[in-house]
């Protein structure tokens, strides 16, 4: 392969590549908490999810309606996932971006959620975590719910 086309191809692929996973131990710890929340969700275990969140953790979902309006749903963990979790739900994320400063961190990533193996929707998750008593805990999770965005988001 001639050198110029190979370099152009490499440059194009690099522009779309996700950032490499962080090697920082604190970043890994932050990401592990978000993953533990997903693991608790998959186990349908409010107790396992509760172990990852701060008291009074808040959740917010954002969904664009068919008429173009935006629906915001806000709920406390204890009033939603903390009460009951349906079995068969699985959520996963990829290409996470972690920003951490002191005792505050965020994890932003595309995600997909399914129930009994069927995709419900994709979107962007934003976890906000705080370090309390030496451990990272989720203070809030915000997300978009975009049923038609999965093909686009899976490319990220």
Pin down the residues of each PLM region.
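Sec-dependent signal peptide recognition
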Residues: 1-9, 129
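Short, low-complexity N-terminal intrinsically disordered segments enriched in polar/charged residues
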Residues: 4, 14-47, 51, 55, ...
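Sec/Tat-exported extracytoplasmic proteins
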Residues: 34-45, 53-57, 61, 81, ...
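Extracytoplasmic
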Residues: 44, 52-54, 93, 102-104, ...
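A mature extracytoplasmic/lumenal domain signature
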Residues: 53-55, 63, 109-111, 125, ...
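Surface-exposed, charged secondary-structure patches
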Residues: 58, 71-120
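Short beta-strand edge/turn micro-motifs at domain boundaries
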Residues: 106, 122-149
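A short, polar/proline- and glycine-enriched secondary-structure boundary/capping micro-motif
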Residues: 117-120, 147-155
